[in-house]
Amino acid sequence: MRNIFNMSTKTETVKRNPADSMVSTWRHDRTQWSLWHWMIELLGLHLIDLKGEVPVFSKKQKIPAVREWTLHLWILLHAAIPLALHHAFVKYTGQNLGLLAAFGLYSTAFKLNGIHEMHIMRRLGQLYGFLDGDKHPRDEIPDVGVGKVIRELISTSTFRMIMAIYLTYQPNETPSTMSWQWLPLEIGIYSITVDFWFYWYHRLMHSTGPLWKFHRRHHLTKHPNPLLSAYADHEQEFMDITGIPLLAYGTMKAMGLPMGFYEWWVCFQYIAFSEFIGHSGLRIHGGAPSTLNWLLELFDAELVIEDHDLHHRYGWRKSHNYGKQTRLWDRIFGTCLDRIESVKDNVDYENRVTMPLL
């Protein structure tokens, strides 16, 4: 007979893949920094200022509402800067920019706009705090992912512009030839079209086992910050950076919309702004600006920051809130998740947030 009192108990320990670690300690020890660490530091890409104090609010405290027109103003002003420089060059020289020069101008502007938006969001975070801040701080870039995050962010602004220039840039078309009368409609339709393709691709990534393995890294963060919008496997990043925008562009052309290079540039700035702010977790009621938000709001289908934040917080294989530009397709296909802090009765429309221009 076996002596059960002398039996040794063997406990199995499940070891986590080190590549899945979200531990972030690198900001406190500069001795091991690489070029990527210094880029984040010198460009000021941190969402949280270690020297500042982030306010913390309970979920029942009112959440301030954003003046959406200030988001449009910010995006359009920053999109207009390279267009104005391009126009000035044409006027001064009588020649248009070549392909390489156009790529250099617009891809650089893309990167600078993203850096400036990050600075603004850090300032807003110091003023208004972050969603679910009473339970958990925002995730930082993990020690194992610093280089990957920066390389993917650079790739976004680089390869999107390579694609746009290759497909749409015409040496005989200057910024003054932009289809201004179509631009407001194109901005709104493009975000909805991008979101249609993204919704189904994103939903399939969650529901299909062979695809989930390419998306799970992105869901290691439960309280993301904007830089972690690029924390994903290469297969996902390929679709995010070029695949989905290309499908949306083809759809727009099939609809008969002009969608030339300059209009696409402006649409890209709207999409990139929404991707960044949607991963910011800022405790403000606002999010993806669109020229058609007035229509989306009639169906409770506009997207605010909390929507994608909840997707990360509670989503894994089974999830909700798959859209990243609107809630239209989530609303149509029944995958909306109830808001917590951005519910209508908890929004303070008297306490308005203005997006700083500088």
Q: What do the PLM-derived regions correspond to, one by one?
A:
Residues 257-346:
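C-terminal transmembrane module of eukaryotic multi-pass membrane proteins
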